[in-house]
Amino acid sequence: MSIFTKSLLTAVCASSLVACVVKQDEAPDDLRRAIPTSDQVRINLPTGTARSLGELAEWYVATRKVTTTFNGGTAWVLVLVHTIVQFPVTSVDGDTYTWGPWSDALDPAEYKLDVRALGDGTYSYQLSGRSKTVAGSSFEVVIDGFADPRPGDLKGNGTFMIDFDAGKRVNPIDSDPDARGQVDVNYDLLARHLDLHIMSTDDAGNPVTADYAYNETATGGGDMVFNIEGDAGGTPLLEQITLRSRWEASGVGRADGRLAGGDLADGATASECWNETFARVYYEDSANFAPTEGNVADCAFATQDLPPL
């Protein structure tokens, strides 16, 4: 958990007029269940810790980095908001429930959470912050979300947006200095589906966009598609890069990749498979980037399957 998250949770407890272990009924009970936990909204990729990085299939490593980035980047949001709504509300104004504003004496920012009951059993929520380091600062929305708990426990759906630029303006001290842009997340717990859209910039200030789509199988496997526009050819021209990874609960999996556009007029595809210990058992590509290895018969998924361009 980040310093930013810890300071917020501490402020919530400190500002409550009652102990944090005390629950009040000012807010609807289903509001507390509306916000999913970080465990409910995550990409579940089997992991192994006993092998060195060099022994692992390269695209398993790439898939793991993508899932780790997503899980880590969104977990603190859900931990924070889900925890706050368990505490007594600070005020109620019609259909809007507010927690805060709160901050410790030495905190560089103060925050509040507003949750609105939309009348049909769904909720919208905003976590806003205001810098204490700049006189006259106004509250800015850092997290903006919508939650629909009506399908039942562990079956809800919703969306949330994280604005990293606003987060840094509100609290430049505790925020991640490398985080920029915004992330939009769409989740459906019943369908075991996640969508993620990122709008950011690279180190040179150039715009970067990326999309993730993830589906979890009933048996614990996964299917993830990652699309990003970036430089793979060494010139200012940008290529479209697609990586689709599929895996079973045991850990065996396959990743298929495609590069198109930019310097790669003819495009290129590649495939890699790994076993239960995440070691490569098969590799091939259409552009002779590297020699073919292994036997496709050892792949858990027999054929290449990429989404259309």
Model-assigned labels for residue ranges:
Residues 81-173:
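Short N-terminal edge-element motif at the start of the domain
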Residues 141-244:
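Short helix-loop boundary/capping segments
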Residues 95-101, 125, 160, 194-198, ...:
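Generic recognition of long tandem-repeat/solenoid scaffolds
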